[in-house]
Every structure is written in C-alpha cells, then in structure tokens.
Design a protein with these regions (language model features):
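Residues lining hydrophobic/aromatic ligand-binding pockets adjacent to catalytic sites
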Residues: 1-112
Length: 112
C-alpha cells in the first residue's frame, strides 16, 4: 500500500483486516493516482478533491514528493467542503475538524 492523503473505507478495511500493514514510500509516484486525490460525493455528484503536488517529478520516490499546503490550497479545500456539505448533519463540527487538520505551518508538506 502506498501513502494516501485521504483516508477511505477500503483503506481502513484493509488495515483492520490485516495482521501487518506496510506502507511503501520507496516506490515511484504517478501523477494521476490517489496519493493526493480522492472522489468525494456530495451535492448530488461525485467530484475529485485534489491537493496538488509541488514540483512533481515522475522519477521521484513517493517519500520525496511534496504536497502544496499553501493558504490558497487550504481555502480551496474548505470551499469545496462548504459547497457540498453545508446542509449536512454535523456540518459545523466537521468543518471545525477540517480547518484544524489543514492548519499547516509550511507551504509544502511531505506526502509521507
């Protein structure tokens, strides 16, 4: 299994079902993978939610890739969440958790 930014049901199930779960960070990365994106349902449709890479290079190992964690990316993710879930139960609590989780100290963060 390679690192993923977003936890999803299949990943959690595989972790729970395994005796030993190994995350590989010494493999090559691919640009259109799920390392930095995931499909999110809401507002009657599915959309890709992506945290962009900074200076992505295919030949780099996953452990050497960085995600763009700038303020503009943070705002984009929060606005994405607001536009799809503002009418959902527990919206305010979930938004608070999201904002806290996105409180990065750097403009780029290592994927691993």
């Amino acid at each position: 299994m390679q690192p993923n930014v977003f936890m999803w049901g299949g990943l959690l199930k595989s972790i729970l079902d395994s005796d030993l779960h190994i995350i590989l960070d010494i493999v090559r990365s691919s640009k259109n993978s799920r390392y930095n994106r995931n499909k999110i349902a809401g507002a009657g449709e599915e959309s890709w939610l992506t945290i962009p890479f900074v200076d992505f290079k295919r030949e780099k190992l996953i452990m050497n890739q960085y995600l763009d964690t700038s303020e503009s990316t943070k705002k984009k993710l929060i606005n994405f969440f607001k536009s799809r879930y503002s009418d959902a139960p527990y919206y305010k609590n979930s938004l608070q958790i999201l904002e806290t989780s996105l409180d990065f100290n750097n403009t780029k963060t290592n994927l691993c």
